[in-house]
Amino acid sequence: MAQVCDMCGKGPQFGNNISHAHNVTKRRWNVNLRPVRAKVNGATKRMRVCTTCLRSGKLVKA
């Protein structure tokens, strides 16, 4: 399942782990997603929403 917010479309960001010896390996920072039941067009729908959208009040919980 994709790590993408259903409200804003925010996805994972990519970068590098850098050790003390400066060994570089790839890594990714995933979005903090939460399963939520929300009202969309008057109907209840299960969505995976990032915590930024939850805190900003972009959706109405069912």
Curated annotation (Swiss-Prot):
One of its GO terms (biological process) is translation. One of its GO terms (cellular component) is ribosome. One of its GO terms (molecular function) is structural constituent of ribosome. Keywords: Ribonucleoprotein, Ribosomal protein. Gene3D superfamilies: Ribosomal protein L28/L24 (2.30.170.40). The keyword Ribonucleoprotein applies. The keyword Kinase does not apply. Belongs to the bacterial ribosomal protein bL28 family. HAMAP family: Ribosomal_bL28. This is Large ribosomal subunit protein bL28. It comes from Koribacter versatilis (strain Ellin345). The gene is rpmB.
